[in-house]
Curated annotation (Swiss-Prot):
Mitochondrial intermembrane chaperone that participates in the import and insertion of some multi-pass transmembrane proteins into the mitochondrial inner membrane. Also required for the transfer of beta-barrel precursors from the TOM complex to the sorting and assembly machinery (SAM complex) of the outer membrane. Acts as a chaperone-like protein that protects the hydrophobic precursors from aggregation and guide them through the mitochondrial intermembrane space. It is found in: Mitochondrion inner membrane. Pfam families: zf-Tim10_DDP (PF02953). Heterohexamer; composed of 3 copies of TIMM8 (TIMM8A or TIMM8B) and 3 copies of TIMM13, named soluble 70 kDa complex. Associates with the TIM22 complex, whose core is composed of TIMM22. This is Mitochondrial import inner membrane translocase subunit Tim13. It comes from the Eukaryota. GO terms for biological process: protein insertion into mitochondrial inner membrane. SUPFAM superfamilies: Tim10-like. Keywords: Chaperone, Disulfide bond, Membrane, Metal-binding, Mitochondrion, Mitochondrion inner membrane, Protein transport, Translocation, Transport, Zinc. GO terms for cellular component: mitochondrial inner membrane; mitochondrial intermembrane space protein transporter complex. Its main location: mitochondrion. It is a peripheral membrane protein.
């Protein structure tokens, strides 16, 4: 059992993961999860709004509705994200 965790307790960096690398990986994973959630919510909302009778194809009005709905959803998401990030920056400046 002596070897268990020895890479972490020893001074060598061969077995250690760099904290910065781990943080970057976590940030990427969070960004991917957020993008997946955004896409899923947008798809659900726009489908419910624009598709009255699901079929094998979308008619012209459904295609236009989906495109406009997704554009509006993304615009709203970006507006909220900018406002949220701005607020976080202001709060961090006061700390």
């Amino acid at each position: 059992m002596e070897g268990f965790g020895s890479d972490f307790s020893s001074g060598s960096s061969s077995g250690k993961m760099d904290t910065g690398t781990i943080m970057e990986q976590v940030k990427v994973q969070i960004a991917v999860a957020n993008a997946q959630e955004l896409l899923q919510r947008m798809t659900d909302k726009c489908f419910k709004k624009c598709i009255g009778k699901p079929g094998s194809t979308l008619d012209n009005s459904e295609q236009k509705c989906i495109a406009m709905c997704m554009d509006r959803y993304m615009d709203a998401w970006n507006t909220v994200s900018r406002a949220y990030n701005s607020r976080l920056q202001r709060e961090r400046a006061h700390i």
